[in-house]
Amino acid sequence: MKQYLQLCQRIVDEGVWVKNERTGINCLTVINADLEYDVANNQFPLITTRKSYYKSAIAELLGYLRGYNSAAQFRDIGCKTWDANANENQAWLNNPNRKGEDDMGRVYGVQGRSWQKPDGSHLDQLKKVINNLSKGIDDRGEIVTFYNPGEFELGCLRPCMHTHNFSLLGDTLYLTSYQRSCDVPLGLNFNQIQCFALLALVAQITGHKPGKAYHKIVNAHIYENQLELMRDVQLKREPFPSPQLHINPEIKSLEDIETWVSKDDFIVSGYQCHDPIKYPFAV
């Protein structure tokens, strides 16, 4: 929690105003932020200086791991975060590749589970990584990336947190996640949860101990219409101790994740928080 607040304060103190062309809104911006999460000791990075809702972030992660391409699929598992980008993003609404209501196109999990090769066949990046790690193999390329510039026009949004690199040292699994852009007041809460949960979950199904998750952000920003709430409300609050995340021990394979696992298989204990803050969202 401390590193999150330090990043927020750094943006407020040192950020440079940049106009975001996609949203048309000014952003207070810094370049390069390195965060890390202690998964080994279950220090779950759920924001405590405002009420945070972790289950939607978990549901979104499950949708990515399943390769979902429709906002309706995400809604069905308890996540509404893709409704706006699928149905209210004007550039995507005008894109001839859009297949209708709720279509997201070839974004995030579609790339992770079905990357198109030059011969027209598809590569399942996630399955390759899970298979290797389950055998104790780390080829220094246990990477799942959603970043495919050749298909950007086929999706509603370029991936923000775009690459996950797993590393195995002995029987301890580590994760380094890379993010090109981060809406810190709103998006980072989700991103922290997902980095932590992804390492914990993959370690569990591959039979390893989780170590640390490292989270590297390039462009970290606060939108102009979020600044007052962050500076004058959230940053004035004292954080509470970190809660813990408990994952259903019956989740033992990628097939389990694909078929029956839900957000309710992830439980948080010891969570104390301040009142909610309703930050505006830029589509």
UniProtKB/Swiss-Prot annotation:
GO terms for cellular component: cytosol. This is Thymidylate synthase. It catalyses: dUMP + (6R)-5,10-methylene-5,6,7,8-tetrahydrofolate = 7,8-dihydrofolate + dTMP. Belongs to the thymidylate synthase family. Bacterial-type ThyA subfamily. GO terms for molecular function: thymidylate synthase activity. DUMP binds at R22, R180, S181, C182, D183, N191, H221, I222, Y223. Pathway: Pyrimidine metabolism; dTTP biosynthesis. Homodimer. Keywords: Cytoplasm, Methyltransferase, Nucleotide biosynthesis, Transferase. It comes from the Bacteria. The keyword Transferase applies. The keyword Methyltransferase applies. Its main location: cytoplasm. PANTHER family: THYMIDYLATE SYNTHASE (PTHR11548:SF9), THYMIDYLATE SYNTHASE 1 (PTHR11548). Its EC number is 2.1.1.45. Catalyzes the reductive methylation of 2'-deoxyuridine-5'-monophosphate (dUMP) to 2'-deoxythymidine-5'-monophosphate (dTMP) while utilizing 5,10-methylenetetrahydrofolate (mTHF) as the methyl donor and reductant in the reaction, yielding dihydrofolate (DHF) as a by-product. This enzymatic reaction provides an intracellular de novo source of dTMP, an essential precursor for DNA biosynthesis. (6R)-5,10-methylene-5,6,7,8-tetrahydrofolate binds at D183, A282.
